A protein has these predicted regions:
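N-terminal beta1-alpha1 ligand-phosphate binding loop
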Residues: 1-32, 40
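Helix-loop-strand module that forms the ligand-binding subsite of alpha/beta enzymes
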Residues: 57-147
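N-terminal beta-loop-helix "entrance" segment that forms/cooperates
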Residues: 39-58
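Short helix-loop-beta junction
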Residues: 23-31, 98, 151-160
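Short, hinge-like loop/turn segments at secondary-structure boundaries
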Residues: 51-55, 95, 180-181
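Glycine-rich phosphate/pyrophosphate-binding loop and the adjoining helix
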Residues: 136-188
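Residues at the starts of beta-strands that form the adenosine-phosphate
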Residues: 1, 33-35, 123-125, 160-161
Length: 188
């Protein structure tokens, strides 16, 4: 089962909405089962509060999301890159859902050194991003912040990922064929 995590406030007319519709159509055409978490439509609360640390269950209100992640074979993230990073709502989702004990863990080994456990190993992900500027600007400014999700967070939890970047989306009304081909390849 695939789990789509969509993080854009406009799920009808935005470039990200076009990507979402395309991904849904491809998964349906290929007979794939999928669920969608639309963070803005669900009014996901991205804020960690002190109470989350004060009770043994911690992040009880995100257990359903954790169950969805646990059940999924593949995660498909669709979001714009704003100021070279993911939207705040998605960062909050990652921080509240991909928690210690669920997505990763640390213990002390026999040698007294920390041992890192990737608890979501075996899962895959596709990260699809839109950018308002061209690839040249992205490369010039650096890619590290925009790639935090796949290169750091997902890998840290044991999830292997593929990435599709759609540059210079401003003024483009439809999903270009070259981007559709890249998405198809990532979903294959």
């Amino acid at each position: 089962m695939d789990l789509i995590i969509f993080a854009h406030p406009d799920n009808k007319r935005s470039h990200n909405a076009a990507v979402l519709q395309y991904v849904k159509s491809r998964l349906t055409a290929n007979g794939k089962e999928f669920e969608i978490i639309d963070l803005y439509a669900e009014k996901f609360d991205p804020i960690i509060r002190i109470v989350n640390f004060d009770v043994p269950s911690g992040f009880e209100e995100v257990k359903d999301y954790q169950d969805m992640v646990r059940k999924a074979d593949r995660l498909i993230f669709i979001y714009p890159v704003w100021f070279y990073n993911m939207p705040a709502i998605l960062k909050g989702f990652v921080e509240r859902v991909f928690t210690s004990g669920f997505a990763y863990d640390f213990s002390i080994g026999k040698d007294g050194k920390p041992v890192h456990a990737r608890k979501l190993e075996g899962k895959n992900a596709v990260v699809i991003n839109t950018f308002g500027h061209g690839e040249e600007m992205f490369r010039k400014r650096g890619t590290a912040a925009a790639e935090v999700l796949d290169k750091l967070v997902l890998d840290f939890c044991g999830i292997k990922s593929k990435r599709v970047n759609w540059f210079s989306v401003k003024g483009v009304a439809i999903l270009p064929g070259e981007i559709a081909k890249k998405i198809d390849a990532a979903l294959a």
